[in-house]
A protein has these predicted regions:
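Active-site-proximal loop/helix of nucleotide/amide-processing enzymes and allied scaffolds
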Residues: 1-16, 32, 55, 72-148
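Glycine-rich, small/polar surface segments that engage phosphate groups of diverse ligands
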Residues: 18-80, 84
């Protein structure tokens, strides 16, 4: 019996739409980049987990939506986050998700996913600079609060 040893080719690509010349130097900068990624009326509707990708100079390469959840939670896969970071040649990332309730306090699950991503990213020499919890009126920064 003959075996067909043909395999499919995997193509990976990243097509930047713009070149940001601005550095993300603090959590407020990250918030200002991330807030406009929410369509009007959606930040209070349900949870979305997003990642902001940065180069060596901490300039924004882009962002991606990792997951879309319900009113009280969303599930983020560490592998999907790191896959996107590797595809964009990111040196650093900023995790972000919103709390539709407006409560800025991180949950136990928020703390756990932050730890998991940070530990996995370290193996790839990618730095998790922050994890922001966003609302329409403000944000919570894991980095600013010493939780990273």
């Amino acid at each position: 019996m003959d075996i067909d040893y043909t395999v499919g080719e995997v193509e990976l690509s990243y097509k930047p739409k713009f070149k940001s010349l601005h550095q993300v130097t603090c959590s407020e900068d990250a918030y200002k980049y991330l807030l406009p990624t929410y369509k009007e009326g959606t930040i209070c509707y349900k949870e979305y987990f997003k990642v902001l990708f940065l180069n060596q100079a901490k300039q924004v390469l882009g962002y991606t939506l990792i997951s879309e959840g319900g009113i009280t939670e969303t599930c983020a896969d560490v592998r999907v986050i790191l896959q996107a970071a590797l595809l964009t040649n990111s040196v650093a990332i900023i995790l972000a998700h919103n709390h539709p309730s407006g409560n800025l306090k991180p949950s136990r699950q928020d703390m756990e996913i932050t730890k998991q991503v940070k530990n996995a990213a370290q193996l790839m020499r990618i730095t998790v600079l922050d994890h922001l919890i966003l609302t329409d009126t403000g944000y919570y920064s894991f980095s600013d609060e010493g939780e990273l």
